[in-house]
Amino acid sequence: MKTTAKLSFMMFVEWFIWGAWFVPLWLWLSKSGFSAGEIGWSYACTAIAAILSPILVGSITDRFFSAQKVLAVLMFAGALLMYFAAQQTTFAGFFPLLLAYSLTYMPTIALTNSIAFANVPDVERDFPRIRVMGTIGWIASGLACGFLPQILGYADISPTNIPLLITAGSSALLGVFAFFLPDTPPKSTGKMDIKVMLGLDALILLRDKNFLVFFFCSFLFAMPLAFYYIFANGYLTEVGMKNATGWMTLGQFSEIFFMLALPFFTKRFGIKKVLLLGLVTAAIRYGFFIYGSADEYFTYALLFLGILLHGVSYDFYYVTAYIYVDKKAPVHMRTAAQGLITLCCQGFGSLLGYRLGGVMMEKMFAYQEPVNGLTFNWSGMWTFGAVMIAIIAVLFMIFFRESDNEITAIKVDDRDIALTQGEVK
């Protein structure tokens, strides 16, 4: 099997795994009697794990272990943990196992990116073509857990633990396949200490003003973006969309198209404009949700347009962000830098977004009694998210001033490395 095919299959299974359990989880936990707060904390597991993931995939992988071997170990461990999590019926039993599972999975996002980056000749041209298979994997998981069982005459498996068991099996599969991936050895031999272990050596990249603005805006954007992941399925179901789990894969279908078109957009418009367009389309998506419902054809169409824009927004911001980080980070810090963005976005940003969204829904947007069949003021919630993103877009447009021909790796000399490792005071 050619290297590109191996990397593409890796991405397919990597994102199939996450999509299989993450989208339908709300339905299963709700049916199992978990409270809204417990469900919120369950979703926050991935964010908590992302905060710690640089320990596993940042500086350790950069210095000591081949990336594909680390991937195999994490996937095998995750398969066992998810299998046992699927057997639980109480929050006390489920939450620790899901958190432990998330600690094995979240590091692999940056890890698979790094494996792909290290084994393609032209990152800006080739990475989107490989990463698009991850989107197809997410779609496949939605179809497998949404439409497919019903098409075959079986009951809907979304509100059951079967998606979690599918996740466990898929994790074991990728664990085996990881041994057939191209060898991606460590690229640095620097001294190892606690600062390096935590990935803090990559923080030196924040001295670059444009990278700092990018990092800060990515952190802020992750908060309102989290509202979509935790609330969209419940919202779409409550306003009348049948089989929302399956229909939400439309966002990934649009992601495929724009992923393949991404090299054209980045070359034609530049990285800054593409990142900005990702923010703008995210705000518009929430705008469509404000007015969407299943009552009329027009308002029903707004729901589907909102779902489709999710793929556009994700591609234009986050996939472009991975490319930008790879361009800015020195070669020996690239895995740590990808882990730093994971820490920023899927970690602290998402965690705060899940908690902020939960508090806002409970304190400000929950109806005492159902209003027109709705238990929450969804329009108010989506308005709040849209305004947040609009403000972030304005900040990014004003303060990020780096043009494409100015994007080069941040220079890190021996003294900088010594400072990050505590050798110079």
Swiss-Prot record:
InterPro entries xref list: MFS_dom, MFS_trans_sf, Nuc_H_symport
Location of the protein in the cell: Cell inner membrane
Disulfide bond sites: none
Periplasmic-side segments: 1-8, 60-63, 112-131, 183-210, 266-287, 361-379
Transmembrane segments annotated in the record for this chain: 9-29, 39-59, 64-84, 91-111, 132-152, 162-182, 211-231, 245-265, 288-308, 340-360, 380-400
PROSITE patterns according to UniProt: MFS
UniProt function note: Could be involved in nucleoside transport.
Identification of the protein by name: Putative nucleoside transporter YegT
